[in-house]
Amino acid sequence: VANGFSLATSLKKTPILLLCGVPLLALIAFSDSHLYWVRDAYDGWRIFQIILLMLLGGYAVFMHTHSTSFSQPLSKTLATALPILFGLMVASSLQAEHSARAAADAALYLLLAISVWAQADLFRKNPTVAAHIAAWIALLPLFTVISLLTGLAHALAGDTIDEWHKSFANIRMLDDALLPCLFLLWQRPAWLAKNTFRNPLLNKLITSTIYFISASYMLILYYDGARAVLISTLVGLGFIAIFRRDSWSKLCLPLLTLLGAGLLFLALKHIILTDFTANPILRTGSSGRDDLWVKTLQLWQEHPILGVGGNNFVTSNPWLLNGHPHNLPLQWISEWGFAGLLALLLLIPLAFNFFRHRQILPVFALGAAIAVGVDALFSGVLDYPLSQMLAVWSFAWLVSFLPTHPLNSSLVTDNEHLVKMTSNTPFLSWQHMLKVIAVVAILTMLFVHGRDIICSNCMSTDQDNAPRFWQYGRALHLVPYGSEAINNAPDALRINR
């Protein structure tokens, strides 16, 4: 009996532990902790992400849902479209030049989508825990703030400037991960919110601290010259200003800190050497995006139906350095063909569902979804492991606030019951399809990258170091550090493709 009780208690705690996965990944990344068994931080984050996504996929397989946020027409659309989408992605992967890369890429994005569904269910069942996790996620970039402020202090003192990005080998990895955290901070969930039962002085202290943290996050974006993230932030705030006029007063926090951080940045530019700034904000040019976008359109023109295969953009001609095109819609249609186009079309009714219920959704959680969507048009926010998980976490939290409709579970056997049970069929169809997809995606990920997950002291390698799935995006597998493959990157590339 004791053992049975202990097992039941452990099973009840498992969903709570799953909720801690994303904040733990963010803590490891922002704190520059080396809690992984591979050489590069990015590869370690990816392995952690794979494990977490497979666990969430497993939860989804055994998840029992008694309500739905989707209308009957939307459920029918999903029930029809999901098998077609899955079939097209399988066909795209099989015909790709590097089919293992394509299969792993398809599995990754399918598991990301399923994790939204799974985490939204967990958030509905544990709303208080979810709110507290949101508050902690919002504060985790403070580790980077401390690193930046330390670097500024050294620069003001005339000392050597240390690299303050720490584990983030690419500034876009940091800036894209910071975007969801910024909107979560502005939402002020859980204990970050004003509380009438709290001491007024404590309320003012917390509010003042949030203003300081928000300005610090904005300062990071200014110093990185993060044009895409800043534009996405403004679009998200603009959406709130236009479609949530009841929340205008809440815009004071982001707008004042946006302005204050900008003025501070300009002042520091006159005091500190300009080379402390990664990129100027008002720079001209597309940073090579136009060449990347032209390549995606060429690839889609050559492979309009099935695409070149997931994660095959980087290995396809013409050769370009970048591992992804910095535009998710173009990435999907060039790599997946009709499957990518169908996935984008499915986002339209889902977005309309959010828009229809915008008045009851947390205003900055809604703004975060808009901002991430815009950022995905210019950056790799949905390509890099940390920003992927933080963005997906924000989406799932937003989904959990949508109104739900209970499914009928009555045991009555009259005609009315038969009609009601029929109305549940579309929901049950796409739910069962998602569970099948989750199993296939987990098995695919284990088949392709199972050896990489357990590879100790390993790293990815190629001659270019353009991140995509791994830090070195042209590699398929990790190889032991110090091996012959590391010393001859071109050979390693041929082997790992």
Feature-to-residue mapping (PLM):
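TM-adjacent membrane-interface loops and short helices in multi-pass inner/ER membrane proteins
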Residues: 288-322, 329, 336-343
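Flexible juxtamembrane loops connecting transmembrane helices in multi-pass membrane enzymes
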Residues: 256, 260-293, 315, 454-467
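Loop-to-helix entry and N-terminal half of a specific, functionally important transmembrane alpha helix
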Residues: 22-25, 356-383, 387-391, 398-399
